């Protein structure tokens, strides 16, 4: 069940400046959990209890209930911890999330990240399958270096495989137009090389991944 005990951080569309372990002690605690099955099980169960705060948008099992909202299922735990930190510090802006994180303790953030990282992503409905080939070509040319060949991410970069197509399109379009509040130079520069049809193709490809 607890697949991430087999690696240290399977760490992964939204590139942000990393919050390194030296700046966030929760990364060290995540390391400890990875090395201790009992701690891991306790964190998972505690995270499952606290995830009720997230289910109305992200789903009980981390599979989004709205196309505009990202899946949290199978997301990299270090990335989720990083995002909690950014929402808390208002370095990432979302009225809903900025309020929710106020009600979370550091341990809540860690435990929720552990819980969602262990959930399975449900297959997405096919989105414009005729664009898959072009989307794969664009992904391999522009995205895989950071997000990995399977789009599972790495380090503190997110898993973008199996995300809802609407979410991918909206986010890439925001980066493209510099409206994205998290806009970071690397991601913005890449997004600005993509036209509307390119973005649709990338979304079609990422949505098709499992």
What is the predicted function of each stretch?
Residues 1-9:
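Bacterial N-terminal signal peptides that target proteins for export
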Residues 23-29, 33, 102-124, 166, ...:
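C-terminal capping alpha-helices of c-type cytochrome domains
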Residues 17-21:
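Sec/Tat signal peptide C-region and signal peptidase I cleavage site
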Residues 63-64, 90-93, 118-130, 145, ...:
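Inter-heme linker and motif-flanking segments adjacent to c-type heme-binding CXXCH motifs
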Residues 8-16:
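Bacterial N-terminal signal peptides
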Residues 54-61, 112, 142-150, 202:
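The canonical Cys-X-X-Cys-His
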Residues 44, 62-92, 98-103, 136, ...:
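Gly/Gly-Pro-rich "capping" loops immediately C-terminal to redox-active cysteine motifs
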Residues 22-51, 114-138:
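Electrostatic cytochrome c docking/interface patches
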């Amino acid at each position: 069940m607890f697949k991430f005990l087999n690696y240290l951080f399977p760490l992964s569309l939204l590139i942000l400046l990393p919050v390194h372990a030296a700046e966030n002690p929760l990364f060290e605690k995540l390391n400890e959990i990875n090395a201790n099955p009992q701690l891991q099980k306790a964190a998972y169960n505690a995270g499952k209890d606290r995830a009720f705060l997230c289910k109305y948008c992200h789903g009980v099992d981390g599979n989004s209930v709205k196309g505009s909202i990202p899946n949290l299922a199978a997301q990299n735990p270090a990335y989720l911890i990083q995002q909690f930190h950014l929402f808390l510090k208002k370095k990432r802006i979302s009225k809903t999330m900025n309020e929710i994180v106020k009600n979370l303790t550091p341990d809540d953030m860690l435990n929720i990240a552990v819980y969602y990282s262990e959930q399975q992503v449900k297959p997405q409905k096919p989105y414009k399958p005729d664009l898959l080939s072009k989307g794969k070509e664009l992904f391999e040319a522009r995205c895989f270096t950071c997000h990995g060949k399977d789009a599972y991410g790495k380090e503190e970069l997110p898993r973008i495989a199996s995300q809802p197509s609407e979410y991918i399109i909206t986010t890439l379009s925001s980066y493209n137009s510099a409206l994205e509040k998290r806009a970071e130079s690397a991601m913005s520069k890449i997004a600005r090389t993509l036209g509307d049809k390119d973005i649709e193709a990338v979304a079609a490809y990422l949505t098709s991944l499992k």
